[in-house]
Amino acid sequence: MKTLIAAYSGVLRGTGSSILSALQDLFSVTWLNRAKVEKQLQVISVLQWVLSFLVLGVACSVILMYTFCTDCWLIAVLYFTWLVFDWNTPKKGGRRSQWVRNWAVWRYFRDYFPIQLVKTHNLLTSRNYIFGYHPHGIMGLGAFCNFSTEATEVSKKFPGIRPYLATLAGNFRMPVLREYLMSGGICPVNRDTIDYLLSKNGSGNAIIIVVGGAAESLSSMPGKNAVTLRNRKGFVKLALRHGADLVPTYSFGENEVYKQVIFEEGSWGRWVQKKFQKYIGFAPCIFHGRGLFSSDTWGLVPYSKPITTVVGEPITIPRLERPTQQDIDLYHAMYVQALVKLFDQHKTKFGLPETEVLEVN
């Protein structure tokens, strides 16, 4: 209001310079407010995914069970009936929706960090692929944004390639959450699903496996570049059985967005985490990011740190119906070497010193 009064006063005095100055002040205030709104939209878009990841499945399960005890019980019956008939859909690649993958909310999600996808080589649509994604981080936010949405234009960068991000099969037993995940092209990380996608779904499929899994998330912390890979060879065996090329993929900055309490080996905290990992498939982490309204407080919103996912050169894999351990070890060693090479080639571009070494555990 003061700005408008100043402009009007300038008109009365006949001073054009005052009018121009007042209008400039007005536009600067408008753009400042717009920038704040934009930032809050980014924060909200990230928070909705974090909450979906953490509590949507459990919350919807509780609500659905409660609905059985209300006048709306028919809704619960209809959904459970649908669930029975649709139970195996996730194992066949799910039910992706390009509309959901192109939601504007994912662009706000991308810009919050920001997240970018770097392509180094073309992929042939006549081949199938298994991407090894590293590191896991706390939630694999880079993997989700790059391969389960179109925010970083994965379909334009790799035309004709259908990405499937693989995650815990238990997520697809959760009502509503399973629909949400499938709409983004997310599938269970189990042998049945991967066998189907690599043998009965044509060519041009790319299955993204976060190789380190829950074990790797336990060591996720800012400033650490380490992968759990030395004894992870199942994905190599699957690639050999189907002749699917292996693609090393490293996400710089994935470990920077959350801080967590690291329990020492042998401590009670680590014992609890390993038991959860063994029997349930995930390891509970004590972590924090920033608050919803301030970066100076703790909360569930990840820190705004750049995440850059670099997709490396595919390793051509022959098809062997019964690969021997020697075959698996050979191509696993080739994969590890390719991943380390990819890390070394790009580390200085994203803020790491030349002396930084990728730790392979």
UniProtKB/Swiss-Prot annotation:
Keywords: Acyltransferase, Cytoplasm, Endoplasmic reticulum, Glycerol metabolism, Lipid biosynthesis, Lipid droplet, Lipid metabolism, Membrane, Transferase, Transmembrane, Transmembrane helix
GO biological process: cellular response to oleic acid; cholesterol homeostasis; diacylglycerol biosynthetic process; diacylglycerol metabolic process; fat pad development; fatty acid homeostasis; glycerol metabolic process; intracellular triglyceride homeostasis
CDD domains in the record: LPLAT_MGAT-like
Subcellular location(s) of the protein: Endoplasmic reticulum membrane; Lipid droplet; Cytoplasm, Perinuclear region
Segments crossing the lipid bilayer: 43-61, 66-85
Major subcellular site: endoplasmic reticulum
InterPro entries: DAGAT
GO molecular function: 2-acylglycerol O-acyltransferase activity; diacylglycerol O-acyltransferase activity; retinol O-fatty-acyltransferase activity
Signal peptide feature range: none
Subunit structure: Forms multimeric complexes consisting of several DGAT2 subunits. Interacts with SLC27A1 and this interaction is enhanced in the presence of ZFYVE1.
Name of the featured protein: Diacylglycerol O-acyltransferase 2
